[in-house]
Amino acid sequence: CVQAMCDLYGVTHIVNTGVAGSLDAQIDIADLVVSTDALYYDVDVTPWGYEPGQLPGMDCLAFPADPALRVAIEHAAALAAPDVRVFAGRVVSGDQFSASSQAKERLAQEFGGMCCEMEGAAIAHACHVNGVPFAVVRAISDKADGSAEMTDPEFETSSAMRCAAVVEELCRAGL
């Protein structure tokens, strides 16, 4: 999707919203995390000299989010959802739902993740390759430790509405 948006529409920024599991004890369900960067946690080509999570041929381990866009999102969140706590940190992405406290600990310790999900690093990767500033915004849906039940539809709706309100506020600000 990001590549198509870059190729066909000449986008100037990408803001991706969704849900994630918290990897930090201070971050609770319904809090927001805005990316400082994004990293794949399921890439391992360490036998060839790469860092865990690093893609061969890439000039970085993690894909840095745009700092000005992150600040604008934090400001928009304060206006659109003043009751929601907002954290800035690393978003780690992989092909598995984090289902144990051991996996959670590994993602936090080895990769420095603040939250984990399944698509933010791919979006960040495409933005990085295309030189498009980006930020990933995640509403926390669970504690990423195996305690999560099926996501509550009411929570999904409220998370989507909260993220949409933040994006609307960004648009009002001219981004």
Where do the PLM segments sit?
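Short acidic/His/Gly/Ser-rich catalytic and metal-binding motifs that mark active-site loops
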Residues: 43-44, 98-101, 143-147
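Short glycine-aspartate micro-motif
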Residues: 12-16, 115-117, 134
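Metabolite-binding pocket within alpha/beta catalytic cores that recognizes anionic/polar moieties
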Residues: 1-71
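His/Asp/Glu-rich mid-to-C-terminal helical/loop segments that flank catalytic regions of hydrolases
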Residues: 144-175
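Active-site rim beta-loop-alpha module in soluble metabolic enzymes
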Residues: 48-115, 130
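Short, well-ordered amphipathic alpha-helical segments that serve as non-catalytic structural scaffolds
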Residues: 1, 5, 71-76, 159-170
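Zn-dependent metallopeptidase/amidohydrolase metal-coordination segment
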Residues: 121-154
